[in-house]
A protein has these predicted regions:
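Divalent metal-coordination and catalytic microenvironments
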Residues: 7, 21, 26, 48, ...
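Divalent metal-binding pocket/active-site signature
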Residues: 130, 136-153, 158-230
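Active-site glycine- and acidic-residue-rich loops that bind
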Residues: 103-109, 174-177, 190-197, 246-258, ...
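Divalent metal-dependent hydrolysis catalytic cores, especially in the metallo-beta-lactamase
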Residues: 61-64, 81-110, 123-136, 163-174, ...
Length: 301
């Protein structure tokens, strides 16, 4: 047990001076005034540094020059360790490694790797995010169309049986039966709507079945029109639904970001959806079987 002292503590609600953070067995036990520290406890003086909660990124394909995607070699514990170190340099302490649309075999390898990683690093990655493969092909984005498919019972059962290491699955609600969505949510997996061409009614059916999140708001979704609100309109009409949004000025116009924040409030969260160049000095990489080039802050194929 030890105490972090002489730092300015940002709790998310208050800014605390003359307080300490007591750490026991690798976890924060409590925050207390300096005067209330136990006698004799080891104190680590931070010299006025800021102490704040780390960022949590719920959609991260890769960073630090590596990707948790594409090949059996890349979907590894070592890749996750590199990603964690790169994240920490920018203040991100926890994340969901995101494995995009791929084969059943590589998905199962991703699950096994996630289990192995969590057994040795319990407070870093927060479980696996499977982005696909049950997407709408017309909104596939960079995902490999040869792997986009409908659910089959065997794979659904496997994912549910491993829900302790699978935190989130992104799917297109119009492509997946409500019963399957309900099965996944009943297993404890957060189901997210994304890469979808759903109508307002189709999206609402998915929400009623248990969808609680939406993946990268506005991107790989149909436009809102006067007569058809579509998936985006359904998200805005669902006050308890959370959604991620990429705020780099390229994926989503800032006016749309502002409007989304006004409508969704604290249900809107930032995601990076980052790839290998984040936190690394590289000019190209492989993603979804394609060579991607990093040019002037933008990834292009």
């Amino acid at each position: 047990m030890y105490a972090l002292t002489h730092g300015r503590i940002y709790t998310g609600h208050d800014v605390l001076d003359d307080h300490a953070i007591v750490v026991a067995n690798g976890l924060i036990e409590r925050i207390c005034p300096l005067a209330d520290l136990p006698a004799g406890i080891e104190q680590r003086n931070l010299g006025g540094a800021i102490i704040a909660p780390g960022f949590i990124d719920v959609q991260l394909n890769g960073c630090g020059g590596v990707q948790f995607n594409d090949t059996a070699e890349a979907v590894s514990v070592e890749t996750l360790e590199i990603m964690q170190k790169a994240n920490e340099k920018s203040g991100c302490t926890s994340y969901l490694p995101t494995l995009i649309t791929t084969s059943d075999d590589l998905m199962k390898q991703g699950v096994a790797v996630m289990r192995d990683y969590l057994s040795n690093h319990p407070h870093q990655a927060l479980g696996l995010h499977l982005e696909g493969p049950w997407l709408n092909i017309v909104k596939k984005g960079t995902h490999n169309p040869s792997f986009v498919r409908k659910p089959d019972a065997a794979l659904v059962d496997y994912l549910c049986q491993n829900a302790d290491v699978i935190t989130k699955i992104t799917l297109a609600p119009e492509m997946v039966a409500p019963e399957t969505i309900r099965q996944l949510t009943d297993a404890g997996i957060v189901v997210s709507a994304g890469h979808s061409n759903a109508t307002f009614a189709e999206a609402k059916t998915g929400f009623r079945a248990g969808i609680r999140f939406a993946t990268h708001l506005f991107n790989a979704m149909p436009y809102i029109s006067g007569r058809e609100p579509g998936l985006v309109g359904a998200i805005f009409d669902e006050p308890d639904l959370y959604c991620g949004i990429i705020v780099d000025g390229l994926h989503v116009d800032y006016a749309n970001v502002r409007n989304a924040k006004r409508i969704k409030g604290d249900k809107l969260c930032l995601v990076t959806d980052a790839t290998a160049p984040a936190g690394a000095n590289i000019e190209e990489f492989i993603f979804a079987g394609k060579t991607i080039y990093y040019r002037n802050g933008l990834c292009v194929d």
